[in-house]
């Protein structure tokens, strides 16, 4: 009799994806982040579902409903904070996952990489709309500032903004539609993640050396299931430490003040995971230019495969490219710091220099280093 996991139409798919999947024998802990992202997504959908049971998407009651969740609902506080800090863990894993892809040349799997970029945009949109829902000061003003960026679109900009708002300002209609989209998008993300995996399993995983590993594959289970479980344990420990000891560490104190359209906070800023893009946006004094730079800061990932000039796929044996990669990582941390600072000297100039360096490394220095390394190998 054939084993049911190999014959049953549905179980067979799970078997080929997570059990008998041939995986390279040398993939490191950097390959754990894919499964961690899946775990984060499941956690966010579950906690979000329970939060949504008690949340009301009305401007008069939204803030009170979040307070009610934290004070009156059984374990509401832990569900709410797991959802809020779960988003931070999601983005930490996302950035690590993308960084891994850039370092080891995983972007040469073009379909997988491009679906990943679409996933990144979708997750960012979902997180932004989720930040608006508690209807605190930073929720309201963050929504106003970010949606207003669309007014930079020539000719149709103003109409576009009012269409998204559902009125002439961020109000009840905006909050209701943001809640609707915030609820539906995680399911879209789940579908995209399935397509992402589908394309990945067409080619098989990359590995740290960047060379084909078809001659040396091992089954995913038990080797990588146990490895993923360890990663999951570490991430969950970090998340629960954050939730139970300092749940508001990554939040903004202004969001504990109910939204007031008549009172602007001294410094409007998004959540920490958007600060690098926000810093790039602010570094250009011209509105349309800033918006284009903001969009380009993410879409630039799509042209990374086209800028690959090295004869080697991975950066494992390319010290010059490694230096540039870690310089880029440091630059992104600098941009994140700058995004949270007020618009004044010396932060303005630091932000502008960091923004220039960001694009310079990806568009110019990385391709040049690849060419130099090719020549060094011939010596």
Curated annotation (Swiss-Prot):
A single cellular component GO annotation: respiratory chain complex III
Family assignment from sequence similarity: Belongs to the cytochrome b family.
Regions that span the bilayer: 33-53, 77-98, 113-133, 178-198, 226-246, 288-308, 320-340, 347-367
Database matches in PROSITE patterns: CYTB_CTER, CYTB_NTER
Cofactor note: Binds 2 heme b groups non-covalently.
MF annotations from Gene Ontology: metal ion binding; ubiquinol-cytochrome-c reductase activity
Note: Heme 1 (or BL or b562) is low-potential and absorbs at about 562 nm, and heme 2 (or BH or b566) is high-potential and absorbs at about 566 nm.
Keywords: Electron transport, Heme, Iron, Membrane, Metal-binding, Mitochondrion, Mitochondrion inner membrane, Respiratory chain, Transmembrane, Transmembrane helix, Transport, Ubiquinone
Xref: InterPro entries: Cyt_b/b6_C, Cyt_b/b6_C_sf, Cyt_b/b6_N, Cytb/b6-like_sf, Cytochrome_b, Cytochrome_b_C_euk/bac, Cytochrome_b_N_euk/bac, Di-haem_cyt_TM
Record-listed heme b b562 binding positions: 83, 182
Localization terms from the record: Mitochondrion inner membrane
Binding site for a ubiquinone: 201
Reported cofactor(s): heme b
Name of this protein: Cytochrome b
């Amino acid at each position: 009799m054939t084993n049911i996991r190999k014959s049953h139409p549905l179980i067979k798919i799970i078997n080929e994806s997570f059990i008998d999947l041939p995986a390279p024998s040398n993939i490191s802990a950097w390959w754990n982040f894919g499964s961690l992202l899946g775990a984060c997504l499941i956690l966010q959908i579950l906690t979000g579902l329970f939060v949504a049971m008690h949340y009301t998407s009305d401007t008069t009651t939204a803030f009170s409903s979040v307070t009610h969740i934290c004070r009156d609902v059984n374990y509401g506080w832990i569900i709410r904070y797991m959802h809020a800090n779960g988003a931070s863990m999601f983005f930490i894993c996302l950035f690590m996952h993308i960084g891994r892809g850039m370092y080891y040349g995983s972007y040469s799997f073009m379909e997988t990489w491009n679906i990943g970029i679409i996933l990144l945009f979708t997750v960012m949109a979902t997180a932004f709309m989720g930040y608006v829902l508690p209807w605190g000061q930073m929720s309201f003003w963050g929504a106003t500032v970010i949606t207003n960026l669309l007014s930079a679109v020539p000719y149709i900009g103003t109409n576009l903004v009012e269409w998204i708002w559902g009125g002439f300002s961020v109000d009840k209609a905006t909050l209701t539609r943001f809640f609707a989209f915030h609820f539906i998008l995680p399911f879209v993300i789940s579908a995209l993640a399935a397509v992402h995996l589908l394309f990945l399993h067409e080619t098989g995983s990359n590995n740290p050396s960047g060379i084909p590993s078809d001659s040396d594959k091992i089954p995913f289970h038990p080797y990588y299931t146990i490895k993923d479980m360890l990663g999951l344990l570490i991430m969950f420990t970090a998340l629960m430490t954050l939730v139970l000891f300092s749940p508001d560490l990554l939040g903004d104190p202004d969001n504990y003040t109910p939204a007031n359209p008549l009172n602007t906070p001294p410094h409007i800023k998004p959540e920490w995971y958007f600060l690098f893009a926000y810093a790039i946006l602010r570094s250009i004094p011209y509105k349309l230019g800033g918006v284009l730079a903001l969009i380009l800061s993410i879409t630039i990932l799509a042209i990374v495969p086209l800028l690959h000039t090295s004869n080697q796929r991975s950066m494992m044996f390319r010290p010059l490219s490694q230096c540039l990669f870690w310089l880029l990582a440091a630059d992104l941390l600098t941009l994140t710091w700058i995004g949270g600072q007020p618009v004044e000297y010396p932060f303005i100039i630091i932000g502008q220099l960091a923004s220039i360096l960001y694009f310079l490394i990806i568009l110019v220095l990385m391709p040049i280093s690849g060419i130099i390394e090719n020549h060094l190998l011939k010596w």
